[in-house]
A protein has these predicted regions:
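Class I SAM-dependent methyltransferase SAM/SAH-binding core
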Residues: 12-73
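A short SAM/SAH-binding and catalytic strip from SAM-dependent methyltransferases
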Residues: 82-97, 119
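Conserved class I S-adenosyl-L-methionine
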Residues: 112-144
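Short alpha-helix
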Residues: 161-176
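A short acidic, Gly/Pro-enriched loop at the edge of an enzyme's catalytic core
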Residues: 71-83
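C-terminal helical/coil "lid" or tail adjacent to the Rossmann-like core of SAM-dependent
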Residues: 180-242
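A short glycine-rich, Lys/Arg-flanked "PGG" loop and its adjoining helix->strand segment in the class I
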Residues: 97-112
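Conserved alpha-helix/loop element of class I SAM-dependent methyltransferases that forms part
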Residues: 1-11, 26
Length: 258
């Protein structure tokens, strides 16, 4: 992602939805001593987590920390940034068009945006699959879990994680005034598992706003149903007999219009 951003020494990088700083810290050596990286997130706890080990960067003027949402970057002045990066952030934003307008506003003319987003609705809903594992014998229980979590297809228009695809993001980018847009859609289907055992699966949440898989199972199923469900999954998960599928969009966007 950072390679595609083409960050140069002396530039100002704004990482929107910085989280634990994966992208922002990676940009620090690229901007050099004369550049600056701004960590931006809605979570003050995450900003504090990023700030603590690198106070010297803030004192030296090489790092900034701003609490703001992608769709409202009002603390960031107009035309003050050379590069905007955002990774797996827009899936949590309902007003995606507003986020793109804010990206355009804070960018200097002829600068760029780099976006990496999973396209969660690329694959159709499949009740025969549960997080990459064959669930055909317990299909009815899978359906009960997803309905309980509001993940049936009827709710997709209201779910910011599911109500868009790569074409929608392209449309938002153009409407915001980003003149040159390059889109790369990457789709992967691979054998294997993304978790080592059932305990890790049930302890995992699909996103920071969601319940863990175990909590979702407990909320949707009776204890007897949950026992049946986990008894089916355990040998598959523990042996890694699954299939991983993913679709994501990575696109450098720019330059902005003057």
């Amino acid at each position: 992602m950072l390679e595609n951003a083409r960050i140069r020494p002396g530039e100002v990088v704004l990482d929107v939805g910085a989280g634990d700083g994966l992208i922002a810290f990676g940009a620090m050596p690229l901007v050099g001593e004369s550049g600056r990286v701004v960590f931006c997130d809605v979570s003050q706890d995450l900003l504090d987590h990023c700030r603590n080990p690198d106070q010297e960067l803030e004192v030296a003027g090489r790092a900034g920390f701003v609490r703001a949402a992608a769709e409202d970057l009002s603390p960031i002045p107009d035309g003050s940034v050379d590069v905007v990066t955002t990774r797996s952030v827009l899936i949590y934003v309902q007003e995606k068009h507003a986020a793109f307008r804010e990206f355009h506003r804070v960018l200097r003319p002829e600068r760029r945006v780099l976006i990496f987003e999973p396209i969660n609705n690329y694959f159709p809903d499949d009740m025969d699959d549960f997080w990459g594992f064959d669930a055909r014998p317990v299909r009815d229980l899978v359906e009960m879990i997803w309905v309980s979590e509001g993940r049936d297809a009827s709710n997709h228009p209201n779910d910011p994680m599911m109500n868009f695809n790569e074409r929608d993001l392209l449309r938002h980018a153009e409407a915001a005034g980003l003149d040159e847009v390059h889109v790369e859609l990457v789709v992967d289907v691979e054998p294997g598992a993304w978790v080592e055992d059932l305990e890790r699966l049930v302890g995992t949440a699909p996103n920071p706003n969601a319940r863990t898989t175990g909590e979702a199972i407990a909320a949707a199923l009776t204890p007897e149903e949950a026992e049946t469900f986990e008894a089916h999954l355990r040998p598959l998960v523990d042996a890694g007999r699954g299939r991983w599928r993913g679709a994501r969009r990575c696109d450098p966007v720019g330059p902005t219009s003057p």
